[in-house]
């Protein structure tokens, strides 16, 4: 790019100093020109800067600190003694950034502007006057923007515009009025840790390429096992891409424990294996059975009571039925915090049955595991210490940025022997350090993302007591919602009694249905209410809450709270918004 002031149409001094009120320099005139649309501003800037021969590329303009000629400071002196220069992104591409020669200055400016975009988004995420979502239908977004991938590179101005556009239409999951999923909130320390993790950009193969992260995973998993109740935090574990994969790990290890020959010889070498889980459990158990060749028909669903808890007597009955057929029960997966009702299976009773029949006991505490951090609520997981394995997702109730899921195993070394393949190019046996820290061979993946650092850094910042306060607050908000709507006109609870978790399940009954008899016609009409209200929520962008049918129950709202930014006022707003949007149905 030609230097400022070198073009035929350049104005003012070569040092680029300018008074915005008196545009007497190329930079100032270029700032004015950027107000023109249709690429005219870029073409004028090209003339002003002496780059008239370079074609101006399309795309929206980005008003940034760098576009005004101020680049990131590279010194520690105050006032700054760094040389000043202009960064016009319209003429810069990714190839101009590091490791390009002289790429430091545009790199610092570009990343600073990306950071500014992110920080603006963060601030907006907590602003209740902003929308949770700027909803557009898929065909609208596809027609409004060109998302296709091109052969030729775009300039950095367009890249910054893409960043802004992407965030404009993204869901603000940190918004205090976003209640749609189990994973909500935006923790600032966790966010900073995620940025650091991406900057380090390493893999969790071995100690030699991820020394600090491997140690932090060891320390953090040990602490989680201590909280579960395993003596001295003994055992094993790994961070996985999510609760579904953690549950599949448990199924894989349980099968290997009972029939180690399956690793080499496959399912043909073992009898038919049967797993058991509740009818309210997560669908990932069946997905895992399909992936491992066990088959979805080999996952038996156990009946639940009206609150969604597994019935132990039905579990034992089904185990005996399977054994009489000559099949082999190998896994019982109990749930601590079901996805819809937030129910906790009776873990002590399940543990007794598993011990009696020598079956691996897994606890899927992906959603409910966070309650172990609370002295007030951890009793709901009584018996989890008797499990052989536990899934625990800190990215749900504990508010750690996605993804952060752990599979904890009580028996040390079992995961390693189950999964190791001794790849000699990674796991050499003659290294000069303790090889037990080369954890990659016990994972199903080869490449593995660093998921531990955000949890570890948040734990250091909050302490266990901080997580406890977070969890206690969310459960108190759920009880507040339940207390308000249980006797409020127009609301019906899906099940009786206080929720055990932050899941509050209810129907909103509009005035037109309140006088109807409780019959099939009423249920049919009621089933259409929640979807319409949800659609209107998204159109207005004011709030979001999930709905679903379950069994013989027609569509109902499932409210979940895991965002510590939410308040009583946000709960009040949700109730008022549901009533406003559903009053005419």
Curated annotation (Swiss-Prot):
Pfam families, sorted: Pyridoxal_deC
Going by the entry's taxonomy, the superkingdom of the source organism is recorded as: Eukaryota
> Which positions carry Phosphoserine?
3, 6, 10, 13
**GO BP of this protein:** carboxylic acid metabolic process
Q: Which GO terms describe its molecular function?
A: glutamate decarboxylase activity; pyridoxal phosphate binding
Per the UniProt record, which residue ranges are transmembrane? none
Give the protein's function: Catalyzes the production of GABA.
* Protein name as annotated: Glutamate decarboxylase 2
What organism is the protein native to? Mus musculus
| Encoding gene, per UniProt annotation | Gad2
């Amino acid at each position: 790019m030609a230097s400022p002031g070198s073009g035929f149409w350049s104005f003012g001094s070569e040092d680029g100093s300018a008074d915005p009120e008196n545009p007497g320099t190329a930079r100032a005139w270029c700032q004015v020109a950027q107000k023109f649309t249709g690429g005219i501003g870029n073409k004028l800037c090209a003339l002003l800067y002496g780059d008239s021969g370079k074609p101006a590329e399309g795309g929206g303009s980005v008003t940034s600190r760098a576009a005004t000629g101020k680049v990131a400071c590279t010194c520690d002196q105050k006032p700054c003694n760094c040389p000043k220069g202009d960064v016009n992104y319209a003429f810069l591409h990714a190839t101009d950034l590091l490791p390009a020669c002289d790429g430091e200055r545009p790199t610092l400016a570009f990343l600073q502007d990306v950071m500014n975009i992110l920080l603006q988004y963060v601030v907006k995420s907590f602003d209740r006057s902003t929308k949770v979502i700027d909803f557009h239908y898929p065909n609208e977004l596809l027609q409004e923007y060109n998302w296709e991938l091109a052969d030729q590179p775009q300039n950095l101005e367009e890249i910054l515009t893409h960043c802004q556009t992407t965030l404009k239409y993204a869901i603000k999951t940190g918004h205090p009025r976003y209640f749609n999923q189990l994973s909500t909130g935006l923790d600032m320390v966790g966010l900073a840790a995620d940025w650091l993790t991406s900057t380090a950009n390493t893999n969790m193969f071995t100690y030699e390429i991820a020394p600090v992260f491997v140690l932090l995973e060891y320390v953090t998993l040990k602490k989680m096992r201590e909280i579960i109740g395993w003596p001295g935090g003994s055992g094993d574990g790994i961070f996985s891409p999510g609760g579904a994969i953690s549950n599949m790990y448990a199924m894989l290890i349980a099968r290997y424990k009972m029939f180690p020959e399956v690793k080499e010889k496959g399912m043909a070498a073992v009898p038919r294996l049967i797993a058991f889980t509740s009818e309210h459990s997560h669908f990932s158990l069946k997905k895992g059975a399909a992936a491992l060749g066990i088959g979805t028909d080999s996952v038996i669903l156990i009946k639940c009571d009206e609150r969604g808890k597994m019935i132990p007597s039905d579990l034992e009955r089904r185990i005996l039925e399977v054994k009489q057929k000559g099949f082999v029960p190998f896994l019982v997966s109990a749930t601590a915090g079901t996805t819809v009702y937030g129910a906790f299976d009776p873990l002590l009773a399940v543990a007794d049955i598993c011990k009696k029949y020598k079956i691996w006991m897994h606890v899927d505490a992906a959603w409910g595991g966070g309650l172990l951090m609370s002295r007030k609520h951890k009793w709901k997981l009584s018996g989890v210490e008797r499990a052989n394995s536990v899934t625990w997702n800190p990215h749900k109730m504990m508010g750690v940025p996605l993804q952060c899921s752990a599979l904890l195993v009580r028996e040390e070394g079992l995961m390693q022997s189950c999964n190791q393949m001794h790849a000699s190019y990674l796991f050499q046996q003659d290294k000069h350090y303790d090889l037990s820290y080369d954890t990659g061979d016990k994972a199903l993946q080869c490449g593995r993302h660093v998921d531990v650092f955000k949890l570890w850094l948040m734990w250091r910042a909050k302490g266990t007591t901080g997580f406890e306060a977070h969890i206690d607050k969310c459960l108190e908000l759920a009880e507040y919602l339940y207390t308000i709507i249980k006797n409020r006109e127009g609301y019906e609870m899906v099940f009786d009694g206080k929720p055990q978790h932050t899941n509050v399940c209810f129907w909103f009954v509009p005035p037109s249905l309140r006088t109807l008899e409780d019959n099939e016609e009423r249920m049919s009409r009621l089933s259409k209410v929640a979807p319409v209200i949800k659609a209107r929520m998204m159109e207005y962008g004011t709030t979001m809450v999930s709905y679903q049918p379950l069994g013989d129950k027609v569509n109902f709202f499932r409210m979940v709270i895991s965002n510590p930014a939410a308040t009583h006022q946000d709960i009040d707003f949700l109730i008022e918004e549901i009533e406003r949007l559903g009053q005419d149905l």
